[in-house]
Curated annotation (Swiss-Prot):
Swiss-Prot/TrEMBL catalytic activity: D-octopine + NAD(+) + H2O = L-arginine + pyruvate + NADH + H(+)
Protein's recorded name: Octopine dehydrogenase
PANTHER family listed in its UniProt record: BLR6086 PROTEIN, OPINE DEHYDROGENASE DOMAIN-CONTAINING PROTEIN
High-level lineage: Eukaryota, Metazoa, Spiralia, Lophotrochozoa, Mollusca
Organism: Mizuhopecten yessoensis
Gene of this entry: odh
Positions with a binding annotation for pyruvate: 118, 143, 212
Length: 400
């Protein structure tokens, strides 16, 4: 039986996944890209040729994977109808358009995958798919599986590196779907090895969407407005106060997880780790001094040379607050977590402090006196936006 897979998107991740998945036996790949004329451009660029994925292996060798998607289209009816798996490889702000496009055509037995999903993926999917949402299964990945770059649009993409392990959460629907883990493993290959998280809220809480805003706040929170000579180091340039803020925000995440388990027995969020433990687990090979969080971040070799987003101004450079570190991580991250914290009845003053500072920098109003009543809440993915106002509604997807 042919496995029908729809890959949504036209960027680096969509190119990579389309090429890898289409190379597997018994897999039919349809690409759906809603952006402008991207589907037409991709179809024209590929012509009658095959899509090439250049994979840089861990042993230093290169492998070329050649394959061809069955169709590249802007028409959701063509791409979605009959698809066993629908995988979104687009930024979180674009998910809404794809959910709306697939809603009339997605089958009850579909597995809908966010690769990656970002916080609020399940809330948005449930809201837009309506009655169908109870039937479909939803899978959320924490990040993309690879570092990848398009080398020639529509024709060639390079995988610079592949993660060894990647966690996903699963909400099983009432309809029978393909086996989620083994199917995704088949499409990707031997690596990354996929593991299942215990709970979808574990993934939401452990997205640690406060990290980028906290580092920006640590460097620019008391900035005098004068240009600096060069972009400061981002991760490796943090101070102890920023590390302390990261720890405080992480402690609030754990408190929310514990409150949910206490209020709603049967929901296991015991794998929610503090951020220091997370660093030790994920970056143990790259950290040179692991005796505390500050040193774990500042001596992390994978962060070498990464600098703050800046823009050139007279006299030097100034912070670029229009960067995705705030424009995505606040509405698609911190505000979603805040919504869950409100439903759990847990105050999160350190997270609130970062949100209040960041929303002013990007010209938005989400949080007003600690409540999600700002005019821009409707542009976020917090559960309250969709009518999931209680823990029970958040956990079950049933609005009350």
């Amino acid at each position: 039986m042919t496995l029908k897979v729809c890959v949504c998107g036209g960027g680096n991740g969509a190119h990579t996944l389309s090429g890898l998945a289409a190379s597997r036996d018994g897999v039919e790949v349809r690409v759906l890209t809603l952006f402008a004329d991207e589907a037409e451009r991709w179809t024209k660029a590929l012509g009658a040729d095959e899509l090439t994925v250049i994979v840089n292996e861990k042993d230093g060798t290169q492998t070329e994977v050649k394959s061809r998607p069955k169709v590249i289209t802007k028409d959701p009816q063509v791409a979605i109808t009959g698809a066993d798996v629908v995988i979104l490889t687009v930024p979180a702000f674009a998910h809404e358009g794809y959910f709306q496009a697939m809603a009339p055509y997605v089958q009850d037995s579909a597995l809908i995958v966010g690769l990656p999903s970002q916080a609020g993926f399940e809330f948005q999917c449930r809201d837009i798919l309506g009655d169908k949402a109870a039937a479909v299964s939803m899978m959320s990945f924490e990040t993309l599986p690879w570092a990848c770059r398009i080398k020639e649009f529509g024709r060639k993409v390079e995988v610079l590196g592949t993660k060894s392990v990647l966690a996903a959460s699963l909400i099983k629907g009432t309809a029978e779907t393909v086996d989620p883990l083994s199917t995704l493993q088949k499409l990707h290959g031997a690596e990354p090895v996929f593991r299942l998280a215990k709970h979808f809220l574990e993934m939401l809480i452990m997205s640690y969407s406060f990290v980028h805003p906290a580092i920006l706040y640590g460097r620019w929170g008391s900035w005098d407005g004068n240009p600096v000579s060069e972009a400061p180091l981002f991760y490796q340039g943090i101070d102890q106060a920023t590390a302390d803020m990261l720890t405080a925000c992480s402690d609030e995440c754990k408190a929310v997880g514990n409150a949910i388990m206490a209020a709603c027995p049967g929901n296991d969020l015991s794998d929610v780790k503090d951020i220091y433990q997370w660093y030790l687990e994920y970056y143990h090979e790259d950290i040179q001094d692991d005796h505390d969080l500050y040193h774990a971040i500042t001596t992390n070799k994978s962060y070498k040379g990464l600098v703050h987003p800046v823009k050139t101004v007279d006299g030097g450079v100034a912070p670029d607050f229009g960067n995705r570190y705030l424009t995505e991580d606040i509405p698609m991250g911190m505000i979603v977590f805040k919504g869950v914290a409100i439903a759990a009845g847990v105050p999160i003053p350190n997270n609130d402090k970062l949100i209040t500072w960041a929303q002013e920098k990007i010209g938005k109003v989400y949080l007003v006196d600690g409540a999600l009543t700002g005019k821009d809440v409707a542009t976020t993915r917090c559960p309250q936006r969709y009518g999931f106002n209680t823990l029970n509604a958040i956990l079950t997807g049933k609005k009350e």
